[in-house]
From Swiss-Prot:
Protein name in the entry: Protein ApaG
Domain of life: Bacteria
InterPro entries tied to this protein: ApaG_domain (IPR007474), ApaG_sf (IPR036767), Uncharacterised_ApaG (IPR023065)
GO annotation (BP), single: error-free translesion synthesis
SUPFAM superfamilies in UniProt: ApaG-like
UniProt xrefs under PROSITE patterns: APAG (PS51087)
Length: 125
């Protein structure tokens, strides 16, 4: 039986007020993702898929190779961290998705990116 790689994904998001224009329905958010390899062998992140949903229910799908122009190799016990951004038409939304990855044998697998909230500070209680 092949052991599934153990990967932990954590995301922290912030509202970028200086780049947002609420009166034009432009709300900018930055998010920092940490991908930790908790397994015993190397893994490589090859691609990503995002489902972005605003508070009106409008969904946008984004997919592509790597993240921020990289396809990082993550050694056991190490992590890869990056920051990216999203622009919504509403002050509240969510993002979720998965990473396409391969293990040290070249076997493909997916790692879930748990849903996280994008919200301006006034909406967070």
């Amino acid at each position: 039986m092949i052991e599934q790689p153990r990967i932990c994904v954590q995301v922290h998001s912030i509202y970028v007020e200086t780049q947002s224009i609420p009166e034009e329905e432009r709300f900018v958010f930055a998010y920092t993702v940490t991908v930790r390899n908790l397994g015993r062998s190397n893994v490589q992140l090859l691609g990503r898929y995002w489902l972005i949903t605003n508070s009106n229910g409008r969904q946008t799908e984004v997919q592509g190779e790597g993240v921020i122009g990289e396809q990082p190799l993550i050694l056991p016990g190490n992590e890869f961290q990056y920051t990216s951004g999203a622009v919504l038409e509403t002050p509240l939304g969510t993002m979720e998705g998965h990473y396409e990855m391969i293990d040290h044998l070249g076997q493909a697998f997916r790692t879930v990116i748990p849903v996280f909230r994008l919200a301006i500070p006034a909406l967070i209680h």
